[in-house]
């Protein structure tokens, strides 16, 4: 029997979502937990699949996975307690054997969290120009044979809790590094280094390329599919671990800034300037 899961994970702790030999990955830990629980005997038997791969450092809030197991009730009841604290399942649904997360997802959305304040209104102006069907090769790392045309259904920038911009974008599918490329262009615009209409230039030029923003700010935010999920029991340790990490990261940020003895925002801006000099007017 095949099961689909809504799941989340803390990307900073993994080399990526897909299995890589001798590296800690989301797939590797998920399959290891299933083997420990007795859901299947090995990775081949598990048939682990996702709605979209994520790179090293990229987190997920609601990602779509699937596995094959003859013990669906056991998986729903106990799998979370055999996973590490930085991976968790929110809900599960029984699906037919032809189900494939990649094709079942009608829409995927991402959020990118920027580290410092920028002009949100300029960024929103630029983000709105991404909506529609375009050739997004200028924002992506292209793979041979991949169609560069995608349809973005939603793109907006708003101010987060800390006053820093947050970029949210949705589409049926994305190219590799496409969202990070968009985020990179938007932060350049938000800092006033180029105008919002540079987006049209990137969409219309077959040779233009933008440097992607760092992976650590990116979250696979949500997936829309025609499934009804049964909620799964959660480990208290997951939220406790995330809260502990958040506190440690905040303290580490303040410590690093104190040791720097200069304005870290200025260093960040200089890095953006170096990476996006080709876009400046």
Swiss-Prot record:
GO terms for biological process: tRNA pseudouridine synthesis. It comes from Methanocorpusculum labreanum (strain ATCC 43576 / DSM 4855 / Z). InterPro entries: PsdUridine_synth_cat_dom_sf, PsdUridine_synth_TruA, PsdUridine_synth_TruA_a/b_dom, PsdUridine_synth_TruA_C, TruA/RsuA/RluB/E/F_N. GO terms for molecular function: RNA binding; tRNA pseudouridine(38-40) synthase activity. This is tRNA pseudouridine synthase A. Formation of pseudouridine at positions 38, 39 and 40 in the anticodon stem and loop of transfer RNAs. The keyword tRNA processing applies. Its EC number is 5.4.99.12. Belongs to the tRNA pseudouridine synthase TruA family. Keywords: Isomerase, tRNA processing. It holds the Pfam family PseudoU_synth_1. The active site is at 55 (nucleophile). Substrate binds at residue 110. It catalyses: uridine(38/39/40) in tRNA = pseudouridine(38/39/40) in tRNA.
């Amino acid at each position: 029997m095949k099961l689909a899961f809504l799941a989340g994970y803390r990307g900073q702790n993994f080399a990526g979502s897909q299995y890589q030999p001798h590296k800690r990955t989301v797939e590797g830990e998920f399959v290891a937990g299933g083997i420990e629980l007795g859901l299947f005997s090995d990775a081949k038997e598990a048939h682990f699949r996702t709605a979209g791969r994520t790179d090293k450092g990229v987190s997920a809030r609601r990602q779509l996975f699937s596995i094959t197991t003859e013990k669906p009730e056991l998986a729903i009841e106990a799998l979370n307690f055999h996973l590490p604290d930085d991976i968790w399942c929110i809900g599960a649904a029984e699906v037919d054997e032809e189900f494939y997360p990649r094709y079942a997802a009608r829409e995927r959305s991402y959020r990118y969290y920027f580290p410092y304040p920028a002009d949100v209104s300029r960024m929103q102006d630029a983000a709105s120009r991404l909506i529609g069907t375009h050739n997004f090769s200028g924002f992506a790392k292209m793979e041979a044979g991949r169609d560069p045309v995608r349809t973005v259904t939603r793109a907006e920038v708003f101010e987060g809790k800390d006053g820093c911009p947050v970029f949210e974008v949705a589409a049926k599918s994305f190219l590799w590094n496409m969202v990070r490329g968009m985020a990179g262009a938007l932060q350049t615009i938000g800092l006033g280094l180029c105008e919002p209409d540079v987006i049209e230039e990137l969409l219309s030029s077959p040779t233009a390329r933008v440097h992607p923003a760092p992976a650590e700010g990116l979250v696979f935010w949500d997936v829309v599919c025609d499934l009804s999920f049964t909620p799964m029991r959660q480990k208290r340790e997951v939220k406790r671990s995330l809260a502990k990490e958040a506190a440690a990261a905040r303290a580490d940020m303040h410590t690093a800034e104190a040791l720097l003895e200069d304005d870290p925002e200025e260093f960040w801006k200089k890095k953006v300037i170096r990476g996006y000099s080709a876009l400046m007017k």
